[in-house]
Amino acid sequence: MAQDSLLSKGYEFADVEEKWLSRWHKQNAFATKMEDGKDAFSIVIPPPNVTGVLHVGHALNNTLQDILVRYHRMCGDNTMWIPGTDHAGIATQNVVERQLATEGKGRHDLGREAFIERVWKWREDKGGTIVNQLKKIGSSCDWERERFTMDEGLSTSVREVFVRLYKEGLIYKGDYIVNWCPRCQTALADDEVEHEDSKGKLYHIRYPFADGSGSVVIATTRPETMPGDTAIAVHPDDERYAHLGEIGIKLPLTDRILPVVFDHHVEKDFGTGALKVTPSHDRNDYEIGIRHGLDLCKVIDEKGMMNDNAGKYAGLDRFECRKQIVEDLREQGYLVEIEDYDHAVGHCYRCKTVIEPTTSLQWFVSVKPLAAKAVDAVRDGQINIYPKTWYNTFYSWMDNIRDWCISRQIWWGHRIPAWSCADCGELIVETEDPTSCPKCGSSKLSQETDVLDTWFSSALWPFSTMGWPENTKELQTFYPTSVLITSFDILFFWVARMMMMGLHLMDEVPFKDVYLHALVRDKHGKKMSKSTGNVIDPLEIMAQYGTDSMRFTLTAFAAQGREIKLDEDRIEGYRHFINKIWNAARFAQMHIGDCDDSIRVAVETPKDLALGHRWILSRTAKLVEGIHRSLRGYLFNEVASLNYQFIWKEFCDWYLEWIKSDLFSDDLVARDQARGCLMVVLETILKTLHPITPFVTEEIWSVLPGERGFLATSAFPEVREEWKDEEAEAEMELLMGIITGIRNIRSEAEVHPSTKINATVICHDSKRADIIRSYTSGISDMTRLEGFTVVAEAEKPADAATYIYNDIEIFVPLAGLVDIEAELEKLSRERKKVEAKLKQINGKLGNAKFLAGAPEAVVAKVTGEKEELDAKLAKIDEASDRLKKLS
């Protein structure tokens, strides 16, 4: 695959990315291998919704997964990364229903079967968008194994699990309080409800005693549920209301008398110590109702409208009903007070409609016994969670978990495999469609119309994608999977449920490690949203800066437990880093392009090499060691930092400069040493960097000399202990300190880079002084010195600038090079000009009339000018301070 052509002057990322995506996929470079005697590494992708398009969270998540997969593949492990998408029941149905609405139709106009066909057609036409975008960011999945949660194989798994759990008594059907979305018209699980802070009202309402002897004030945020009140609850020890058990309380606006129940759930010191109990529309009230055998009176229907039980309010929208009831309470003297009240209101996670707690006949999973196994697995260390700060949150949630409502009143999804017999009422739950009732023989069977919660099929993802319930070779080789990488916000939606299902059905954990990454926010730490205009589109970023730049940026920001504040300026900065690598490789190619493998022999005996080569090999060995350690500890940002610091600071800024004279030398031994080390170090860099930036590294690798396969499938470097050389590192660090000192003096004194200068080093340690002297030539070349001396003592000239490195003093005479007084005078004049402009602008910005009357864009422009002038003033002052130090 090696080419003879020299790398182009500039890195044209669009062409390179297209080329390697095509070649990798054409040659099936990422196919799963199951070779005997090798370690296995497997990941299942968190399946994005089939309705989705790539957002920056997807880009982060899949970049981190890809880094691990590429690393383990290069380490020689049997590696499998299964891609796929989720059918996303509610979301997908909503998309297709909106499409139908543009045609003036609803799903009921089509009927269930035709509607489902329409959804499949939509999936065929549009569902591949997110998959193609995941490929575009370089995800090295085994794309031949792509799965969909409604695939035939996965549907078989879902049915099998449902039937098993039902027959074990872990799935049941019951009339319970659920979260209901009036827009989607379906039940939602607890963790599908998003609670948002809301500025509401608290209504204080007088409930009269039935005998007219008094009343009690009860506060509620939801007066529209009053027609559904079936009791008043007080604490058993509250003597104020002890007598009411025999009397009862009148429900305002009606003639109904409500019983008083005594329940320990009531806090007698909170408010008046009395609660209205509406079992059909509040979870806590429902529990009270069950304990006391209260009637269920449902007053709000599936569309969020008041039903016939609401009396004269029937037909009103629930929020309109609230207004009407409050007005009626006021008119009839029952309304005592309305106060502002901040509280959390539940919303549907899909359509954002305010949810309605209501009683409904639904299917549930009894999760307590399943959750206990998952908690034990985490406590025992069978599953590790990264970062560790999530352990307590996990335990707390699992300890307080409630049964999972798994039925959804929609059409798109896995239809529940349960049938009812019309003749005898028998409920039949089987993996295969029954033809007759096993109890009475009737053929009049009707299947449950509800479908399963999308998260039910997703909870089986780690093993259903590998062919369960069949005992496949994939399951034998790759289950449990190695690690799950996902966002922390679906720890309970998905991660915990996979633990429960995996442990119960497979008797093994579904993954050994869980890495929870943070959400990606804008540079100010604010949540990205279209309404605020701060969304960073990864596809636009890739088009502007290149995919590798985006991947490297996301990796650099992915510190465990830390919020990711994405700044486009940093993406641009890392694009410069990619260009730096390209230019360094191009320089190297000019010198090693005609080499063969024999040139590498130099690195086999590093002790015989010159200092610069021994130093870079030692640093390379430590780079590789650090990369292995960081990747196995999921310290992704450290992997980026190690590569960045080594490549930019050590390899490019120091090593390439240090060996230039050898590369152009007539001394063939010195030249071959330099070329051999350069090739080996460059190859190592490409390998350590490849998991993060696959495109640029694969392109550079392909043009290096020799026969080469894909870099993506080459061997990851091992730590070369024989390369480690503490003495070489100490000596090189000393020389780098001297060179840095001389360069700093030149920079601060603003001496032109081409101007030759003299430098003197005062070093009292004779051993270090000898080392410095022995590299006079190298130091002089890298700092453009005319004269260089190393002494134990010397008198510093009056016009010399000084730099202290540890206990070593460096000075450079500046006579004839810099007129400090003239430079200071010039800076002083420039400062006065800037101050005058700044005074004008500050006057404008301090003028209330200007701020109130000028267009927002004009104010923003003036503010920007002020910031630029402030920055310019700071630079002038910095330059003045530097010169004063030299004077």
UniProtKB/Swiss-Prot annotation:
Sequence motif: 'HIGH' region, positions: 48-58
Keyword Protein biosynthesis part of the UniProt annotation: yes
Record SUPFAM superfamilies: Anticodon-binding domain of a subclass of class I aminoacyl-tRNA synthetases, Nucleotidylyl transferase, tRNA-binding arm, ValRS/IleRS/LeuRS editing domain
GO molecular-function term, one example from the UniProt record: ATP binding
Keywords: Aminoacyl-tRNA synthetase, ATP-binding, Coiled coil, Cytoplasm, Ligase, Nucleotide-binding, Protein biosynthesis
EC number, UniProt record: 6.1.1.9
Motif 'KMSKS' region positions after renumbering to this chain: 527-531
InterPro entries the record matches: aa-tRNA-synth_I_CS (IPR001412), aa-tRNA-synth_Ia (IPR002300), Anticodon_Ia_Val (IPR033705), M/V/L/I-tRNA-synth_anticd-bd (IPR013155), Rossmann-like_a/b/a_fold (IPR014729), tRNA-bd_arm (IPR010978), tRNAsynth_Ia_anticodon-bd (IPR009080), Val-tRNA_synth_C_sf (IPR037118)
Protein biosynthesis is among the record's keywords: yes
Single biological process term from Gene Ontology: valyl-tRNA aminoacylation
GO CC, any one term: cytosol
Swiss-Prot/TrEMBL catalytic activity: tRNA(Val) + L-valine + ATP = L-valyl-tRNA(Val) + AMP + diphosphate
Any coiled-coil regions, as ranges: 814-887
Subcellular location field: Cytoplasm
Residues that coordinate or bind ATP: 530
Quaternary organization: Monomer.
Family (UniProt): Belongs to the class-I aminoacyl-tRNA synthetase family. ValS type 1 subfamily.
Record remark on domains: ValRS has two distinct active sites: one for aminoacylation and one for editing. The misactivated threonine is translocated from the active site to the editing site.
The protein's role, per its UniProt record: Catalyzes the attachment of valine to tRNA(Val). As ValRS can inadvertently accommodate and process structurally similar amino acids such as threonine, to avoid such errors, it has a 'posttransfer' editing activity that hydrolyzes mischarged Thr-tRNA(Val) in a tRNA-dependent manner.
Protein's name according to its UniProt entry: Valine--tRNA ligase
Organism encoding this protein: Desulfotalea psychrophila (strain LSv54 / DSM 12343)
